[in-house]
UniProtKB/Swiss-Prot annotation:
Annotated protein name in UniProt: Large ribosomal subunit protein bL9
Residue span of region Disordered: 172-196
Entry-linked InterPro entries: Ribosomal_bL9, Ribosomal_bL9/RNase_H1_N, Ribosomal_bL9_bac/chp, Ribosomal_bL9_C, Ribosomal_bL9_C_sf, Ribosomal_bL9_N, Ribosomal_bL9_N_sf
Described function: Binds to the 23S rRNA.
GO biological process: translation
Keywords on record: Ribonucleoprotein, Ribosomal protein, RNA-binding, rRNA-binding
Acidic residues bias (residue ranges): 181-196
UniProt similarity note: Belongs to the bacterial ribosomal protein bL9 family.
UniProt-listed Pfam families: Ribosomal_L9_C, Ribosomal_L9_N
Gene Ontology cellular-component terms listed: ribonucleoprotein complex; ribosome
PANTHER family: 50S RIBOSOMAL PROTEIN L9
GO MF, any single term: rRNA binding
Length: 196
């Protein structure tokens, strides 16, 4: 189906372009969301008569998005999740979770504006792109951690890949696996028992 784009669509075209797309994509997304019109003579005339108004509205939305992007770009958000000792999350951080965290700070974004290829499944610092407008993208940093203290330490640049780094110096020395499974100590004990 041929459609006339009413706004810039990534990987498809600019406003006013006549493009051929699959029927389902046109009916279920472009036409339903008001992002395109069917490309027939009546709609082409209608688009040309409203082109100046559409371009002005698009420019206004773009300037609003740029104002929000200036406030949002480079901000850091903390996401607290439970995770294994290896840093793998029990679950994941999805686009919806990211949108909720950013919205809790007072920014209005939807989950469809968060651009991640796949859910985030490990703790650490992650950069995420947020498309506020087809031509305006802001980048935020997610600090994914097990606790607020751990998030603070990650933000300072500490690596949290060992038990000492995660739990600090207060680790019980007798709880170390080497103390339980020292094969040399077992051999010495057996030799001492045999000699007695």
């Amino acid at each position: 189906m041929e459609v006339i784009l009413l706004e810039r669509i990534p990987r498809l075209g600019q406003m006013g372009d006549v493009v051929r797309v699959k029927d389902g994509f046109a009916r279920n997304f472009l036409l339903r969301q008001g992002k395109a019109l069917r490309a027939n003579d009546a709609n082409r005339k209608k688009f040309e008569s409203q082109r100046v108004e559409l371009e002005a509205r698009n420019l206004e939305r773009k300037s609003e998005a740029q104002a929000v992007a200036e406030k949002l770009d480079g901000k850091s958000f903390v996401v607290i999740r439970s995770a294994a000792e290896t840093g793998q999350l029990y679950g994941s951080v999805s686009a919806r979770d990211i949108a909720d965290v950013v919205a809790s700070e007072g920014f209005k974004i939807g989950r469809n504006q968060v651009d991640i290829n796949q859910p985030i499944k490990t703790i650490g610092l992650t950069n995420v792109a947020i498309a506020l407008h087809p031509e305006v993208v802001a980048t935020v940093t997610l600090n994914i951690a097990r606790s607020a203290d751990e998030a603070e330490r990650q933000a300072r640049g500490e690596t949290l890949d060992s038990a000492e780094a995660i739990y600090g110096e207060e680790i019980n020395e007798s709880a170390r696996p080497e103390a339980f499974f020292d094969p040399e100590a077992e051999i010495e004990q057996e030799e001492g028992e045999e000699n007695a």
